[in-house]
């Protein structure tokens, strides 16, 4: 059996899809389905069972027997960078992750988890997987950073793979439940469907992000499991592209529209990453040779999926 936490979420459901594609359907999905809209992410996929997140944690603490587990993909967390309830974030993103990590270490189960480029904070270069380059700007980034630091402490003694991925700007299918936290491409497509022009913040031509297609993210996770990879790695394309490139790809798909600029919101000014670009040196050194879709390629594929 394979366990995917956050399996109804964007990245989790795409990992389930990637597992299905290699013939694995013996999947236990763990999630909090309070947001019932997320169920649509798995309706076309095959899983063996579902467990509520709180029940799952209780089972782990109680020492319940889950049978033979081949891997745990831990994608379940609060992913809202705008969430400032520190107690809530530390419970969901740190304490929960520690419980699951120790469960996997105790049973020698390969453990793959979601970290984030938010751990780097507002830097404009050297997105390198080392403590000296990490200075998160928000509580979400700090919760992810702290777990990375915890993993660094236990990695030298681990007898089974422990692998974290610092996800950069992930976009693509199965994110419609995320509301305001969904990708720019998703929101721009919705604006176009309403007959509006795609809207970007003023100055967005200077905002460069490493936009990585979610199916590429899932592929790297599967590769890491199949190859017994340990460590903490950046997961982006290695190339920063502009929000304008995203908007242009959406316009090109729809065959109409032009970019409209709107004022930059004051509440984001000191907490907004204006540049992200994954340094893939470590991932490539670990042996990953796969390619990553460009914004034009990924957005075109995503638009076709959204408008199918």
From Swiss-Prot:
Keywords carried by this UniProt record: Carbohydrate metabolism, Isomerase, NADP
GO terms under biological process: ADP-L-glycero-beta-D-manno-heptose biosynthetic process; carbohydrate metabolic process
Record-listed NADP(+) binding positions: 10-11, 31-32, 38, 53, 75-79, 92, 144, 170, 178
Record carries keyword Coiled coil: no
Disulfide bonds: none
Annotated catalysed reactions: ADP-D-glycero-beta-D-manno-heptose = ADP-L-glycero-beta-D-manno-heptose
One of the record's GO molecular function terms: ADP-glyceromanno-heptose 6-epimerase activity
Binding site for substrate: 169, 180, 187, 201-204, 209, 272
Pathway: Nucleotide-sugar biosynthesis; ADP-L-glycero-beta-D-manno-heptose biosynthesis; ADP-L-glycero-beta-D-manno-heptose from D-glycero-beta-D-manno-heptose 7-phosphate: step 4/4
Enzyme class: isomerase
InterPro entries referenced in this protein's UniProt entry, alphabetically: Epimerase_deHydtase, Heptose_epim, NAD(P)-bd_dom_sf
Similarity-based family: Belongs to the NAD(P)-dependent epimerase/dehydratase family. HldD subfamily.
Protein name: ADP-L-glycero-D-manno-heptose-6-epimerase
Organism of provenance: Actinobacillus pleuropneumoniae serotype 5b (strain L20)
Lineage summary: Bacteria, Pseudomonadati, Pseudomonadota, Gammaproteobacteria, Pasteurellales
């Amino acid at each position: 059996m394979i366990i995917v936490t956050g399996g109804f979420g964007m990245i989790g459901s795409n990992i389930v899809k990637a597992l299905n594609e290699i013939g694995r359907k013996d999947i236990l999905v763990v999630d909090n389905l309070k947001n019932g809209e997320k169920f649509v992410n798995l309706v076309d996929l095959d899983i063996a069972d579902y467990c509520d997140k709180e029940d799952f944690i209780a089972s782990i603490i109680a020492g319940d027997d889950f049978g033979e587990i081949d891997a745990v993909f831990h994608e379940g967390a609060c992913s809202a960078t705008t969430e400032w309830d520190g107690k809530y974030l530390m419970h969901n993103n740190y304490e929960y992750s520690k419980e699951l990590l120790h469960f996997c270490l105790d049973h020698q189960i390969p453990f793959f988890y979601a970290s984030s480029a938010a751990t780097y904070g507002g830097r404009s270069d050297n997105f390198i997987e080392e403590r000296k380059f990490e200075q998160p700007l928000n509580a979400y980034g700090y919760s992810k950073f702290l777990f990375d630091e915890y993993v660094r402490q236990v990695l030298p003694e681990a007898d089974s793979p422990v692998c974290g991925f610092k996800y950069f700007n992930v976009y693509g299918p199965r994110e419609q439940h995320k509301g305001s936290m969904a990708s720019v491409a998703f929101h721009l497509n919705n604006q176009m469907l309403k007959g509006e022009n795609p809207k970007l913040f003023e100055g967005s031509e200077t905002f460069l992000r490493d936009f990585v297609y979610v199916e590429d993210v899932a592929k790297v996770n599967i590769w890491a499991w199949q190859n017994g990879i340990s460590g903490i790695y950046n997961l982006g394309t290695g190339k920063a592209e502009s929000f304008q490139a995203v908007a242009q790809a959406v316009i090109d798909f729809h065959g109409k529209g032009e970019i409209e600029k709107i004022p930059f919101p004051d509440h984001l000014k000191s907490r907004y990453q204006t540049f992200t670009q994954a340094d893939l040196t470590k991932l490539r050194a670990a042996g990953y040779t796969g390619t990553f879709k460009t914004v034009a390629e990924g957005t075109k594929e995503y638009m076709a999926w959204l408008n199918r």
